[in-house]
A protein has these predicted regions:
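Structural recognition of the beta-strand scaffold that forms the well-ordered cores
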Residues: 39-40, 83, 103-104, 137-139
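Short acidic/histidine-rich motifs immediately flanking catalytic phosphotransfer sites
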Residues: 95-102
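Short, hydrophobic/aromatic-rich segments at coil-to-beta transitions
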Residues: 204-211
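A glycine-rich, often tryptophan-bearing local segment used as a flexible ligand/cofactor-contacting loop or short
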Residues: 114-191
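Solvent-exposed loop/turn segments at secondary-structure junctions
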Residues: 45-47, 107-111, 143-147
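Hydrophobic targeting/anchoring helices
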Residues: 1-69, 165, 169-170, 187, ...
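Conserved small/polar residues in nucleotide/adenosyl-binding loops
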Residues: 223-225
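A short, well-structured beta->alpha microelement
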Residues: 75-93
Length: 225
């Protein structure tokens, strides 16, 4: 009844609906072009596709808002995105061969990043084999992080960083030089906004630091150019 009082609005909605019908007629049943196959790895997999960092109607929380944009960016990018769980890898150790890039996003010891799954030999072996064979691994926050056997980042040899928890205070940390010319930063203008960012992250010797703030690494790469 309320809409009847605004005929121009009703007419506009009718036109928009017709535009969507035309789009659907043109693209139904057609697979869109995708540049790469991307897997988002967490404890839920498909169970929480596209919503793995949203809590209670996506209410803002300081602890996880920095991760929202990653999933949102993937939704509009030309990638074939799948959400897989650690149990999926345990059930099929060759699962990662279907993908070009694996993304692990979240704070340490959460369902988003994986927690104790990263001490499982099958998981570690599958991810390292994937990277060794040319796959890309992107970690945001505290990926593959769980304190175990003297390491916090269980993929430190792939990620190129470690997080100081008071166990390595006397370890020499000389790698602080930034490489702003790196291809990952070529399309950026001005400062990169990391949201809350991360504290106490330091780079290993062979790592290319892209951005560090007050000797706290925020972005890096092990791809040398």
């Amino acid at each position: 009844k309320l809409a009847l009082q605004f005929p121009d609005f009703v007419q506009y909605i009718k036109e928009v609906c017709q535009e969507f019908r035309t789009l659907y007629d043109n693209i139904q049943g057609v697979t869109p072009y995708c540049v790469k196959r991307v897997a988002v790895l967490n404890c839920w997999g498909r169970m929480r596709s596209w919503g793995n960092h949203m809590v209670h109607h996506a209410i803002y929380y300081k602890q996880n808002y920095s991760y929202f944009g990653i999933i949102e960016a993937l939704s509009g990018a030309p990638f074939d995105v799948s959400f897989i769980s650690f149990d999926d890898i345990l059930a099929d150790k060759d699962l990662l061969k279907k993908f070009d890039v694996v993304i692990n996003v979240g704070d340490a010891d959460t369902a988003q990043s994986g927690g104790e799954y990263w001490v499982n030999e099958t998981i570690i072996t599958a991810v390292k084999e994937f990277v060794y064979n040319g796959g890309g691994f992107i970690g945001v926050g505290e990926p593959a992080a769980h304190q175990w056997q003297g390491k916090f980042f269980q993929l430190d040899d792939i990620l190129g960083v470690e997080e100081e928890h008071g166990f390595n205070l006397n370890t020499d940390k000389y790698n602080w030089e930034e490489h702003r010319e790196h291809f990952i930063l070529q399309d950026t203008d001005g400062d990169v906004d990391f949201g809350e960012g991360k504290k106490n992250i330091y780079a290993l010797p062979e790592t290319d630091i892209l951005i560090q703030n007050d000797q706290e690494v925020q972005m890096l790469s092990l791809i040398h150019i």
